């Protein structure tokens, strides 16, 4: 059995684009959670740096993550996000070391 693929996506909004980025990210949550390979999808905003968002993500495997990236709603977000992001999205993959 494969270990889940767990990651944090770090997204920093351009000045004046914080709300647009937040709304775009919030719009991804419901359809992503309905994907058969999704295990976790939760959005956070950094307290001391408003406009910096972290999406905690877990998918059952690489194929499930690839399927997520190919969805029409993620593709729409990715196309729009270029205008909202101050720097390229950073995707940090994590390895669980405790229960």
Task: Give the residues covered by each predicted segment.
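Short, structured helix-loop boundary elements
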Residues: 18, 22, 52, 71-74
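Glycine-rich beta-strand-turn "strand-cap" elements at beta-sheet edges
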Residues: 1-5, 43-49, 79-99
């Amino acid at each position: 059995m494969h270990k889940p693929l767990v990651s944090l996506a770090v997204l920093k909004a351009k000045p004046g684009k914080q709300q647009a980025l937040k709304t775009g990210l919030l719009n991804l949550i419901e359809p992503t959670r309905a994907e058969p390979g999704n295990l976790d999808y939760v959005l956070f905003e950094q307290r001391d740096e408003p406009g910096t968002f972290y999406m905690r993500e877990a998918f059952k495997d690489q194929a499930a993550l690839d399927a997520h990236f190919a969805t029409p709603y993620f593709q729409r977000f990715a196309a729009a996000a270029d205008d909202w992001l101050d720097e390229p999205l950073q995707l940090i993959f994590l390895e669980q070391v405790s229960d």
